[in-house]
Structure formats: structure tokens, C-alpha cells
């Protein structure tokens, strides 16, 4: 059975409460998430020998998350990754977005979802966070209502589900910007770790990390 505790972790510069949720299962594994940026703060899991370690990177104090350039563990949007030159065309209309990464638009702008307080609530063994992005927010068309659902169970499985509704055709690409170190935070480099992604295709990017729009076959890639 998963138990969920919550407490006020700190305050934003604007005086909003930052809530920290701790989800703990019967095996002693736990996940901590915050309503600031709908962020994963820590994931403490047993390794193959049963030794517990925090396997994601995070900050010990909430102030570390204020406009954190690495967006550690945060939910980013409206659009994760880059939009070239901060310009996009939707249904024949051109929209200009904030340029916040060299000459490009990154992760939805400076005041993207990673740098906001989300509404949050507990539902049985899950935490649900939500926010409303108004029409024109960061230059995007349409009001966007977003939910991030964090599920944790006694098999040590953590699942995030993102849901979005909009009243206009728009661009939405939500993700969580978590950094893993399966040997434990602070244990050293992850360059010798092996990762398997159950994906059949990969989105091609150019040398500026801008998506080209081409979907490439993932078969045979490293």
C-alpha cells in the first residue's frame, strides 16, 4: 500500500506555497515530488542487492528550483525542446514566441510550466497536478488545461501521465526533465550506463538541436 504525506516545503518569491509530497510504498521505496514545476525531487529505490539510493538528481532546498536552467525533474511545456527562431505557423497564422535560447525558443519560454506553481491534490495512491495556460501565454494560441498524474505502486513503478485540453489548434509537447543516475545521486558519471528505450522511431535534429520534422527508424541505432 502506498502512503502519501505532504508538507509546505517553502515559498516562492511571490509568496506562493511550495508543497512537497512523499509517496512511500510497503517496500520502503519513496518518491518525492513538488508542485513547483510539477517536479520529481527524489526517487529512492533499492538496487539489485537491496541497497537504497536516490536515483535522480535534485536539490535539497526548494530555492534550487527557482529558474533552474537544467529544469531538474520538472515538467516542461508548452513545448519541450526548441522551436527555431521562436517562430511557428499554425493553421496558416504565424506566431512569434519568446527567444530564450540563443536565437531559438526553448521549453515554452522563460515562464514555462517548469517555473510555475501547479494546483495539486492527492487521489488514493497518486498525486494529480494541474494548471491553466491562458490563450496567448508565452505567445501560444489557445487556452490549455494541463494535468500531470504521478502514480507509484508497491512494485516500485513510477508512472507519469500528462493530459492536455485546448480550445484552439496549438502546439503541445509535454515532458518531464528528470535526470537519472541509477548508481545513486553523487556516485559519479553515467556514461557507462546502458539504457533501453522501447521506441521504433526517433525524431531527427540538426546540428543546432532543432527538429527537422523527419522521423527516422530506430532499428540498428546504438
Predicted regions and their residues:
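An exposed, glycine/acidic-rich loop-and-rim segment of catalytic or binding clefts
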Residues: 1-222
Amino acid at each position: 500500500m502506498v502512503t502519501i504525506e505532504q508538507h509546505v516545503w517553502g515559498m516562492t518569491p511571490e509568496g506562493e506555497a511550495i508543497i512537497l509530497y512523499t509517496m512511500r510504498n510497503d517496500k520502503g521505496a519513496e518518491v518525492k515530488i513538488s508542485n513547483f514545476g510539477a517536479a520529481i525531487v527524489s526517487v529512492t529505490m533499492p538496487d539489485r542487492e537491496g541497497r537504497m539510493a536516490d536515483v535522480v538528481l535534485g536539490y535539497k532546498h526548494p530555492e534550487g528550483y527557482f529558474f533552474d536552467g537544467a529544469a531538474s525533474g520538472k515538467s516542461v511545456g508548452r513545448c519541450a525542446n526548441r522551436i527555431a527562431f521562436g517562430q511557428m505557423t499554425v493553421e496558416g497564422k504565424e506566431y512569434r514566441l519568446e527567444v530564450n535560447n540563443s536565437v531559438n525558443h526553448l521549453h515554452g519560454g522563460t515562464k514555462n510550466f517548469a517555473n510555475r506553481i501547479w494546483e495539486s491534490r492527492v487521489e488514493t495512491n497518486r498525486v494529480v497536478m494541474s494548471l491553466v495556460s491562458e490563450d496567448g501565454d508565452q505567445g501560444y494560441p489557445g487556452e490549455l488545461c494541463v494535468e500531470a498524474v504521478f502514480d507509484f505502486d508497491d512494485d516500485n513503478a513510477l508512472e507519469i501521465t500528462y493530459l492536455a485540453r485546448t480550445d484552439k489548434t496549438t502546439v503541445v509537447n509535454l515532458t518531464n526533465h528528470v535526470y537519472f543516475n541509477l548508481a545513486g545521486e553523487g556516485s559519479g558519471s553515467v556514461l557507462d550506463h546502458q539504457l533501453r528505450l522501447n521506441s521504433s522511431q526517433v525524431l531527427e535534429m540538426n546540428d543546432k538541436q532543432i527538429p527537422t520534422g523527419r522521423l527516422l527508424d530506430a532499428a540498428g541505432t546504438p
